[in-house]
Swiss-Prot record:
This is Putative 4-hydroxy-4-methyl-2-oxoglutarate aldolase 1. Belongs to the class II aldolase/RraA-like family. GO terms for molecular function: 4-hydroxy-4-methyl-2-oxoglutarate aldolase activity; metal ion binding; oxaloacetate decarboxylase activity; ribonuclease inhibitor activity. The lineage of its organism: Eukaryota, Viridiplantae, Streptophyta, Embryophyta, Tracheophyta. It comes from Arabidopsis thaliana (Mouse-ear cress). It holds the Pfam family RraA-like.
Length: 166
């Protein structure tokens, strides 16, 4: 998609919004990383205070995808840190959405990748690898399914059942 704001996407796709094919996440996320505008096909992960499964995905080639992580909204520890974000950047991921906390904010802000998270927290998560992958999530009042498309900029985050060409 050429540079078109999420607001313009919403304006041009009112019927998709009414039908639920295009959905906006509630505005609860902080913006991190150098890439403030990003989009791509969604890969979903559901974890709780454990980042082993997240790290596993970010070790793979991203091919412009967006990893969407439902961390249960936990504010007790960070499930994403600087090292995996650097790896994600190097492996070609477009962005990472975290329904939870991150840490190593200065390092992440230096990376050419888009990251959204609820907050930062200095305590790290466990690395047991527990969680679910490629499942439907409900984050910030919005259903997000593996394989859908995500569009993010400084106005907000949209999820679409199909790739949009605006």
């Amino acid at each position: 998609m050429a540079f078109v704001t999420t607001a313009e996407v919403c304006d041009a796709n009112q019927e998709m919004i009414r039908s639920g094919q295009l959905r906006a996440l509630q505005p609860v996320f902080q913006i991190y990383g150098r890439r403030q505008i990003f989009s791509g096909p969604v890969v979903t992960v559901k974890v709780f205070e454990d980042n082993g499964l997240i790290r596993h995905f970010l070790e793979e080639k991203g091919n412009g995808r967006v990893l969407v992580v439902d961390g249960g909204g936990s504010l007790r520890c960070a499930i994403l840190g600087g090292n995996p974000v650097v790896q994600a950047q190097n492996n070609g991921w477009a962005g990472i959405i975290v329904n939870g906390c991150i840490r190593d904010v200065d390092e992440i802000n230096g990376c050419d990748i888009g990251v959204r998270a609820l907050a930062s927290h200095p305590i790290k998560a466990s690395k047991k690898g527990l969680g679910e992958q490629r499942v439907s999530l409900n984050i910030a009042g919005t259903r997000i399914c593996d394989g859908e498309w995500l569009y993010a900029d400084t106005d907000g985050i949209l999820v679409s059942q199909i790739e949009l060409s605006v």
